[in-house]
Amino acid sequence: MLYPIPIAKLIESYSKLPGIGVKTATRLAFYTIGMSDEDVNDFAKNLLAAKRELTYCSICGNLTDDDPCHICTDSSRDKEIILVVEDSKDVSAMEKIQEYHGYYHVLHGLISPMNGVGPDDINLKSLITRLMAGEATEVIVATNATADGEATAMYISRLLKPAGIKVTRLARGLAVGSDIEYADEVTLLRAIENRTEL
């Protein structure tokens, strides 16, 4: 069915979001059209504000509205441990369990030879710089349990072990192929507590 151009464009915009197919995008577009002007304006304003006001922390790479982020400026955290994650959603998932008290490093991707993504294409150099300049003695690699997550974990391990840095991996309470952001708090807590050395 053909829709008027403004609705078709709105459907197209919604369907660019991850996990949103044409059917859901169509539902969202029609819902948006039915919203009050005030709600639509607030929605648009919030989208633009998030895009303009958020940045990446210059230390850890986490999404933040302050640079450095509130985690990196928290001196009560354990300076000896850095937990390495794929993206900012994983930081939020780990923070929900309120049991990890070290710092983070966000890679903004994973090494993926099949997709042409190498170590230089992710936020790895700044991790090395941080480790050489800081007090961290352990890196916990908390990438997802996928082929790319495993490849990234092994690369980080081979890179850091010669420097005398202990490299551990989250325990396997997480299903292979699953994303950290979708794991429940108990699973994440056990994965940290039972981490294994790489």
Swiss-Prot record:
Function summary: May play a role in DNA repair. It seems to be involved in an RecBC-independent recombinational process of DNA repair. It may act with RecF and RecO.
Pfam families in alphabetical order: RecR_C, RecR_HhH, RecR_ZnF, Toprim_4
SMART domains: TOPRIM
Organism: Streptococcus equi subsp. equi (strain 4047)
GO molecular function: DNA binding; zinc ion binding
HAMAP family noted in UniProt: RecR
UniProt-listed InterPro entries: DNA_Rcmb_RecR (IPR000093), Rcmb_RecR (IPR023627), Rcmb_RecR_Znf (IPR015967), TOPRIM_dom (IPR006171), TOPRIM_RecR (IPR034137)
Keyword hit for DNA damage: yes
Keywords, ordered alphabetically: DNA damage, DNA recombination, DNA repair, Metal-binding, Zinc, Zinc-finger
Family designation: Belongs to the RecR family.
Listed name of the protein: Recombination protein RecR
Gene3D superfamilies per UniProt: 3.30.60.80, 3.40.1360.10, 6.10.250.240, RecR Domain 1
